[in-house]
From Swiss-Prot:
Name of this chain's protein: Anthrax toxin receptor 1
SMART domains to which the protein is assigned, alphabetical: VWA
Biological process, per Gene Ontology: actin cytoskeleton organization; blood vessel development; negative regulation of extracellular matrix assembly; substrate adhesion-dependent cell spreading
Protein family per UniProt: Belongs to the ATR family.
UniProt cross-references to PROSITE patterns, sorted A to Z: VWFA (PS50234)
VWFA domain location: 42-213
Extracellular side: 26-319
Location relative to the cell: Cell membrane; Cell projection, Lamellipodium membrane; Cell projection, Filopodium membrane
Sugar-modified residues: 164, 182, 260
Keywords per UniProt: Cell membrane, Cell projection, Disulfide bond, Glycoprotein, Membrane, Metal-binding, Phosphoprotein, Receptor, Signal, Transmembrane, Transmembrane helix
GO cellular component term of the entry, any: cell surface
Function: Plays a role in cell attachment and migration. Interacts with extracellular matrix proteins and with the actin cytoskeleton and thereby plays an important role in normal extracellular matrix (ECM) homeostasis. Mediates adhesion of cells to type 1 collagen and gelatin, reorganization of the actin cytoskeleton and promotes cell spreading. Plays a role in the angiogenic response of cultured umbilical vein endothelial cells. May also act as a receptor for PLAU. Upon ligand binding, stimulates the phosphorylation of EGFR and ERK1/2.
Residue spans of biased composition, Basic and acidic residues class: 400-420
Length: 562
């Protein structure tokens, strides 16, 4: 593999480990309130113990101690490596917290001295990464290298070569430069310039970059949704966490499922965001199978582990629910048919009696208060006897009288007493103890209750209207049936439009019978008187409506004599 290829692979591996560190800083909080990382990966500290840091070793130790306590995942492993003229592994890779505590004690006892051979420290880290990969773990690795000086040209070449070798094994490399460092050299040793943390204010400022390292290097898996799936069905899983877009190339991010600690299946996610991944999951055919969720940031070269487990369970299909809904729908349809069928089939005509008119004693028909009318002494009109002997008063507008009655002309000496008030208002009702009923305060739900009451009245009115139309027991009727009858002969247009279907048919036209045969008249036995000549003018016919039709004559009309 060429140098560029090894560099790219190593950078991807280091990115994965660094992202895990960032997740630790973002994913949770420690008991003391500081940021923490729950990512599961291998963390290597490569520390410069050359003579230039002789008087600043305590600052370096406290920096490592504080940073180590931020990674609290039980699946995280840690190693301490120091370098000067040669590299030394103070503590091998371990997840045992007691051994980590002892390793920190050994680190505190280190006496700095010697030259700055950074490549020696990278060699010790690459050896452990290679050994762990050969064991089949393939865990993501993060390397944090700290130095305070500028490397000579040949030492820089060796350091860059060993850093590329670590990247080829799947590690992500971060560099911390203190005071007199060469930032260009550290940018080439680390994955990129963004993976370099400069501390220009000296060793006492190391505590200020702990949060930045956690934020940039931690990738953690917090949860999976759903965590329980149906056996034998395909599904998609949403991986919740932090730092998923911290990879150098998001196209190389993979979701990994380790099934029953034996088979590992990798799937490319549909969506990659900083706080979640949307991944297709493999089909788990048996009930009780478990799949441990992992994430790879370098196309499967190494993986960030987690404690998130996806389990399978037995699920029933939705056919039972569909059948139940279908039965419920059929029952509802039958109920509606039973209710509305008599309305469509049985025709019952009833005359609904008019509603009784309630006479209000307090108000008129138009809803206005009862009007007070003038009191007239009817004795002057002749009421109660001749001449109005007995006194009688009449209030206009009461007991059959109308307002127009008040406009009648009164007698000259009639006495009229006008009321003090024109309208008579109803008095408020009192309780049994002669106390008025207090008005109830308006509640917050009064508008809602009013609208619901109005809706209920509307529904009730519609129900009563339909209920009245339904036939009662004992009612008889006939089902409506529409039949279309085809006529073989087309209808003829009437000859005379003056006759309608409601008038009787016209009378047939009368035809007189043929005249009788001509016979000679017999000889006259006596002279006949002369026939008077008809008058020149005829009297007008009587003014009477013409008959509808004339009856036919019983005999032929006489012929005029010559």
């Amino acid at each position: 593999m060429d140098r560029a290829g090894r560099l790219g692979t190593g950078l991807r591996g280091l990115c994965v480990a660094a992202l895990v560190l960032v997740c630790a800083g973002q994913g949770g909080r420690r008991e003391d309130g500081g940021p923490a990382c729950y990512g599961g990966f291998d963390l290597y500290f490569i520390l410069d113990k050359s003579g230039s840091v002789l008087h600043h070793w305590n600052e370096i130790y406290y920096f490592v101690e504080q940073l180590a306590h931020r990674f609290i995942s039980p699946q995280l492993r840690m190693s301490f490596i120091v370098f000067s003229t040669r590299g030394t592994t103070l503590m091998k890779l371990t997840e045992d917290r007691e051994q980590i505590r002892q390793g920190l004690e050994e680190l505190q006892k280190v006496l700095p001295g010697g030259d700055t051979y950074m490549h020696e420290g990278f060699e010790r880290a690459s050896e452990q990464i290679y050994y762990e990969n050969s064991q089949g773990y393939r865990t993501a690795s993060v390397i944090i290298a700290l130095t305070d000086g500028e490397l000579h040209e040949d030492l820089f070449f060796y350091s860059e070569r060993e850093a590329n070798r670590s990247r080829d094994l799947g590690a992500i490399v971060y560099c911390v430069g203190v005071k007199d460092f060469n930032e260009t050299q550290l940018a080439r040793i680390a994955d990129s310039k963004d993976h370099v943390f400069p501390v220009n204010d000296g060793f006492q400022a190391l505590q200020g970059i702990i949060h930045s390292i956690l934020k940039k290097s931690c990738i953690e898996i917090l949860a999976a949704e759903p965590s329980t799936i149906c056996a034998g069905e395909s599904f998609q899983v949403v991986v919740r966490g932090n730092g998923f877009r911290h990879a150098r190339n998001v196209d190389r991010v993979l979701c990994s499922f380790k099934i029953n600690d034996s088979v590992t299946l990798n799937e490319k996610p549909f969506a990659v965001e900083d706080t979640y991944l949307l991944c297709p999951a493999p089909i788990l055919k048996e009930v009780g199978m478990k799949a441990a969720l992992q994430v790879s940031m370098n196309d499967g070269l190494s993986f960030i582990s987690s404690s998130v487990i996806i389990t399978t369970t037995h699920c029933s299909d939705g056919s039972i629910l569909a059948i139940a809904l279908l039965i419920l729908f059929l029952l509802l349809a039958l109920a509606l048919l039973w209710w509305f069928w008599p309305l469509c089939c049985t025709v019952i005509i009833k005359e609904v009696p008019p509603p009784p008119v309630e006479e209000s004693e307090e108000e008129d028909d138009d809803g206005l208060p009862k009007k007070k009318w003038p009191t007239v002494d009817a004795s002057y009109y002749g009421g109660r006897g001749v001449g109005g002997i007995k006194r009688m008063e009449v209030r206009w507008g009461e007991k059959g009288s109308t307002e127009e009655g008040a406009k009648l002309e009164k007698a000259k000496n009639a006495r009229v007493k006008m009321p003090e008030q024109e309208y008579e208002f109803p008095e408020p009702r009192n309780l049994n103890n002669n106390m008025r009923r207090p008005s109830s305060p308006r509640k917050w739900y009064s508008p809602i209750k009013g609208k619901l009451d109005a809706l209920w009245v509307l529904l009730r009115k519609g129900y009563d209207r339909v209920s009245v139309m339904r036939p009662q027991p004992g009612d008889t009727g006939r089902c409506i049936n529409f039949t279309r009858v085809k006529n073989s002969q087309p209808a003829k247009y009437p000859l005379n439009n003056s006759y309608h279907s409601s008038s009787p048919p016209p009378a047939p036209i009368y035809t007189p019978p043929p005249p009788a045969p001509h016979c000679p008249p017999p000889a006259p036995s006596a002279p006949t008187p002369p026939i008077p000549s008809p008058p020149s003018t005829l009297p007008p016919p009587p003014q009477a409506p013409p008959p509808n039709r004339a009856p036919p004559p019983s005999r032929p009309p006489p012929r005029p004599s010559v």
